């Protein structure tokens, strides 16, 4: 009888330990959040654009590589301000799209757009890079990646990609013009100054 009691107590203790371990593991999973993927079938799109600039890489980057210089080459009338963080440093947030600087090298940076309430998150990231080709020429590369799976169909996805490609092709052309010391034409759909 005494041995039976010891056996029952031992089994009960093991069962209790097992239950406590399971509860602890479940609590850890809950603390880490749900691991369910939000976008079941993402459709990642990459747009890679490039142009050659007739200036040395250091001169090109000095002219167009500032994080808020986007307002010049994208011709944003409202301009650009750093909302938080330090300008040109990882973690800086600019007023253009609420974009966060998430990576940088001597002649490149990568940014992302933040999640917005009520809007599907498309994981949008952009990278601007300047690479020396020769001592006097530079290749500018602008790469975008984003998920367009939330768009209704292939036609909408193609239209979206074509629109982004047009905007950033113009932006890259504007960067080249500025880096080479030129003056930008008026933005599309806006009259020239003085008209």
Where are these regions (language model features)?
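Bacterial N-terminal signal peptides that target proteins for export
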Residues: 1-12
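Bacterial N-terminal signal peptides
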Residues: 11-21
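Hydrophobic ligand-binding cavity/cleft-lining segments
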Residues: 23-81, 194-195
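Glycine-rich portal/gate segments that line the openings of hydrophobic small-molecule binding cavities
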Residues: 52, 69-72, 79-125, 174-189, ...
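A short, structured loop/turn motif at beta-sheet edges
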Residues: 54-58, 101-107, 129-139
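Surface-exposed, polar/charged faces of alpha-helical domains
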Residues: 58, 62, 155, 159, ...
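Solvent-exposed, polar/charged alpha-helical surfaces in well-ordered, non-transmembrane soluble domains
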Residues: 58, 62-68, 166-173, 177
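Beta-strand/loop substructures that line and gate deep hydrophobic ligand-binding cavities in soluble
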Residues: 116-170, 188
